A protein has these predicted regions:
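Membrane-proximal stem/loop segments at transmembrane-domain junctions that anchor or position
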Residues: 36-66, 239-348
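Membrane-interface alpha helices of multi-pass inner-membrane proteins
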Residues: 178-193, 228
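Membrane-interface anchor segments at the N-terminal boundary of transmembrane helices
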Residues: 91-106, 324-406
Length: 472
């Protein structure tokens, strides 16, 4: 009999090895953010073609040194990659595949932990769920960023581990799983300020289900939840330079909200901006002429407009929020539009097409169709909620609460990725994509389990009936 766990992990490992290790190596091009992580390790891409190409090789030189002021769990992961590189590097340069190995190992660890959760279900359902998870999460949209230094990556990987460990604690009640469940949320939340809000949902889940999370006592989970909330607050408050939030605020304000406003002067006033900012409309924060290269301008702008004020603006102007969300989702309905190959591969700036079927399907349905994307998400969430309520008696205690926290996290990432910035939208939506696919996967599992259980019940009920008819 085939061992589904070994087959699944080996299949996932083979896909990662083919994509991340074998030439031509696939990754996700730097948009300028890598230095926030790797500058402290004296690394810089040898060619460094922003957006268009990845760098397989990074030079290690003192003049590359820069400490960015950002806090992220990607930094210790990069340190592990640097140590690994020291063991295998022949020329003293850094090989990008080392970070791919570190990220890939975490992904495969999540896969290894996931499969036993299906041990008690029907064999056909188990293999179907493994195949579907492989199809979704080994897609190029997720795999290419494993060979990168983006700070979203640990949030994605440790979120997967958090979800898997929660289900393992519910199902198996092992101490090691409980300890990992206490650790992984912190590593996910501490990856990037944008994703720190997820800590509140996870903390709520730990408090609400503390009674069923064995063998750790309730007080341990309450303490973990409190510490997780404090970590989330610290990440929002101190994990990046004080004026860095002005950049995404600038982008969404002047590139998305104001260009679509029918009365720009009134909209600027509602946002707390005066007419002097009219010249910024249509500009990107990181490009010349935006004014953002002037620290004084940034400080004045952030004094006038904050995320809190933006949230109030959206609440007062739901039509603007809706239009911004739809416009953003229209751009998000595809994999990252960055180059995936090193320039030495001889390709023009291009995206890999291998193992990209799931991305292609979503791109065909959702790209430039933001309303369809939003309706699909709302429909999926509604279906998931209905299935949870219908099936809750057959589910382990705590799963119903976890399901609704998952929905809440999905809406949180939807809002963060669509309403708070207007640049690199598919990359910023990585966790929203992951949660979208997670909810879809859960819907398939609940539907298959329910259908199989009803089929068995009908079969069992039919057997005595036939026996009664044919009895002498």
């Amino acid at each position: 009999m085939l061992d589904s766990r070994r087959v699944f992990v080996l299949a996932a490992g083979a896909i990662l090895f083919y994509q991340l290790i074998l030439p031509p190596v696939v990754g996700l091009a730097d948009n300028g953010d890598f230095a926030k992580v790797i500058g402290r390790f004296n690394l810089r891409g040898r060619v460094h073609k922003t957006y268009g190409y990845i760098d397989n090789v990074y030079t290690i030189r003192p003049e590359n040194h820069w400490v960015s002021g950002f806090v992220s769990t990607e930094i210790p992961l990069a340190q592990l990659a640097v140590w690994l590189n020291r063991l295998i590097s022949k020329d003293g340069n850094f090989d990008l595949r080392c970070i791919g190995v570190v990220h890939g190992a975490l992904f495969l660890f999540a896969v290894w932990l996931f499969v036993p959760l299906l041990a008690g279900v029907d064999r056909g359902v188990r293999w179907a769920m493994c195949a579907l998870a492989l199809f979704m999460y080994c897609d190029m949209m997720y795999v290419n960023s494993l060979n990168s230094f983006y700070m979203d990556e640990p949030s994605y990987l440790f979120l997967l581990l958090t979800v898997v460990e929660f289900l393992r604690v519910i199902q198996f009640g092992r101490r090691l799983d409980a300890v990992l469940l206490m650790i992984c949320p912190f590593l996910a939340v501490a990856s990037k300020t944008q994703h720190a809000l997820l800590g509140f949902w996870i903390a709520l889940l730990l408090v609400a289900t503390a009674g069923v999370l064995k063998p750790i006592r309730r007080s341990g989970w309450y303490t973990t939840a409190i510490c997780l909330v404090l970590t989330s607050v610290l990440m929002i408050w101190k994990a990046q330079p004080a004026d860095y939030a002005s950049y995404p605020l600038y982008n969404v304000t002047f590139e998305e909200i104001l260009p679509h406003s029918q009365n720009a002067v009134r909209t600027m006033a509602d946002l707390g901006l005066d007419d002097s900012y009219r010249t910024c409309i249509g500009k990107k924060a990181f490009l010349a002429g935006s004014g953002m290269d002037d620290r004084g301008f940034r400080e004045r702008f952030i004094e006038r407009l904050s995320y809190g004020k933006l949230a109030v603006f959206y609440a007062k102007h739901p039509a603007a929020a809706f239009h911004t969300m739809i416009d953003s989702l229209s751009d998000q309905g595809r994999q990252h539009a960055f180059g995936n190959f090193d320039i030495s591969a001889g390709y023009p700036p291009a995206e890999s097409k291998a193992f990209a079927l799931w991305s292609d399907v979503k791109s065909h349905v959702f790209y430039h169709h933001g309303l369809a994307f939003l309706l699909a998400f709302l429909s999926l969430v509604t279906l998931f909620a209905v299935l949870l309520l219908v099936e809750h008696k057959s589910l382990p205690r705590g799963v119903l609460t976890a399901g609704f926290c998952l929905i809440g996290a999905g809406f949180t990432e939807l809002g963060l990725s669509t309403l708070c910035d207007s640049m690199d939208l598919p990359r910023h939506a990585l966790l929203f994509f992951a949660l979208f696919d997670m909810i879809a996967l859960a819907c398939v599992y609940l539907a298959l389990s329910s259908g199989l259980r009803k089929t068995k019940w009908r079969t069992a009920a039919a057997v005595p009936a036939r026996a009664t008819i044919t009895a002498p």
